[in-house]
Curated annotation (Swiss-Prot):
Belongs to the peptidase U32 family. Disruption phenotype: Deletion mutant lacking both trhP1 and trhP2 shows reduced 5-methoxyuridine (mo5U) formation in tRNAs. This is tRNA hydroxylation protein P2. It comes from Bacillus subtilis (strain 168). Its EC number is 3.4.-.-. GO terms for biological process: proteolysis; tRNA modification. InterPro entries: Peptidase_U32, RNA/ubiquinone_mod_enzymes. It holds the Pfam family Peptidase_U32. Involved in prephenate-dependent formation of 5-hydroxyuridine (ho5U) modification at position 34 in tRNAs, the first step in 5-methoxyuridine (mo5U) biosynthesis. It comes from the Bacteria. GO terms for molecular function: peptidase activity.
Amino acid sequence: MKKPELLVTPTSTADILPLIQAGATAFLVGEQRYGLRLAGEFSREDVTKAVEIAHKEGAKVYVAVNAIFHNDKVGELGEYLAFLAEAGVDAAVFGDPAVLMAARESAPDLKLHWSTETTGTNYYTCNYWGRKGAARSVLARELNMDSIVEIKENAEVEIEIQVHGMTCMFQSKRSLIGNYFEYQGKVMDIERKKKESGMFLHDKERDNKYPIFEDENGTHIMSPNDVCIIDELEELIDAGIDSFKIDGVLKMPEYLIEVTKMYREAIDLCVENRDEYEAKKEDWIERIESIQPVNRKIDTGFFFKETVY
């Protein structure tokens, strides 16, 4: 039985080696000009350094090129993708067909992973993009376990799912927070380093707090809870899911390292010793709950809910 890749989104190049030592086998990085909702901002120099560190340790580096592109940016894609290929990244993650077209012209040997956040909901669509050149499909977070397994059974490409972290609920290209501050006569710095400013939308009826931040790609509203299925990995591993992702957006490096250690142990035991995996489930959940940020509970997302599509 194969072990799935353990993919983590690091906050900086300083995270790469500690996360590899914690058990990560792949990383998703990028810069906000081309990628969406990343845990950290990786310049070209950072990407090159991340590849150097990861490859030395036998890990992979993927770069997010999954932003919503308008005419003003499409002319840059070819040159950026050529840089990624030259830097030796293991794949570019895309959603916009413009990236696929640019890659064919400027970086034909660069491996591509297809990810659109919400529309990876069936194996026909996954296979369509596979036949267009994608080696992997990243599934929507709103799918339940049965749907994920069925997709994997019929997929012609690798399948990636998110197993831990917050998920995006809303994105607008508009500067909603900046406009609100401007209306109040205030100034807001929307640089990437300011996104951990602790702003929330408060739903009093459900008593939920939704993290909200703004960057070059607009305004993003995130889920009030973190997905955590460390105790529900059996069916996914048995199905042969290729990659498990821990999303580190709005998380501290120390948190990511501890969670990665636990998922590494869980994956290894689930493959090698099911009885011991079963025995340790409660301990992992308790340990994760003990390091969760204030007011952020964990749940199983849509894995055991009726699919909303």
